[in-house]
Regions:
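Hydrophobic anchor residue at the start of the ABC signature
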Residues: 126
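Helix-to-loop junction immediately C-terminal to a conserved catalytic motif
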Residues: 44-45
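Conserved ABC ATPase signature
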Residues: 112-116, 120
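Q-loop/switch helix immediately C-terminal to the Walker
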Residues: 72, 79-98
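Conserved ABC transporter NBD signature motif
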Residues: 49-61, 69
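Helix N-cap at the start of a conserved alpha-helix in ABC-type nucleotide-binding domains
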Residues: 148-150
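Catalytic Walker B motif of ABC-type/P-loop ATPase nucleotide-binding domains
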Residues: 137-141
């Protein structure tokens, strides 16, 4: 049985879908701009209204308190949000090994957020998500603005986390090469429908 299973599931603007993603899998999600990729991720994280049921390990989302579901099924938006100007304030705990693997300096937790480049913010957002230890990672173009070296770092860190924690990853990407590198399977949003493709 799939770790994450969607049963007649979808946000208002998409047709209901019946799809699943297994433990240890990365599913890549693509579709034209404005097709509903972000809407689907936000609905899966129970941040936006939707119909149908999302299941995690054979338990419906309704079995979980909303904060518990959102910790287990964790959404990383394309634009990260920072509510305090000190990096450390955004982490339940700082994992130096993850920061290093992402190519970030060890002293970065003590930096002001306002000092960070856009690429540093993007990689820190990945580290912050992993520090929550989710079971399902919903990643909305997490490498969109990164150079090839840092893109490779993020891909490797996420894959290592997935493999170590038997996690499931849903990764939005417009990069066909990246989808081929990462995806065990592929979902496509087209004409308001989410479907699995070869």
């Amino acid at each position: 049985m799939a770790r994450l299973r969607l049963e007649d599931f979808g946000p208002e603007l998409l047709s209901p879908c019946n799809l699943g993603a297994d433990t240890g899998e990365t599913v890549t999600l693509t579709g034209p701009s404005g097709s509903g990729k972000t809407l689907l991720l936000r609905a899966l994280a129970d941040l936006d209204p939707h119909r149908g049921v999302a299941w995690l390990n054979d338990r419906p989302a309704t079995d979980f308190a909303a904060p518990d579901w959102r910790r287990r099924v964790c959404y990383l938006p394309a634009e990260s949000h920072w509510w305090s100007d000190r990096v450390r304030d955004h982490f339940p705990h700082v994992d130096d090994a993850t920061l290093s693997a992402l190519g970030l300096p060890g002293e970065i937790p003590d930096w002001a957020v306002s000092r960070l480049s856009s690429g540093e913010r993007q990689r820190l957002a990945v580290a912050r998500l992993l520090s929550v230890q989710p079971e399902v990672l919903l990643l909305d173009e997490p490498t969109a603005n990164l150079d090839p070296a840092n893109t490779e770092r993020v891909e490797r860190v996420v894959a290592d986390y997935r493999d170590r924690n038997a996690a499931t990853v849903l990764w939005v990407s417009h990069d066909a090469d990246q989808r081929e590198r990462l995806g065990h399977r592929h979902w496509l949003i087209r004409d308001g429908r989410v479907e699995e493709t070869a």
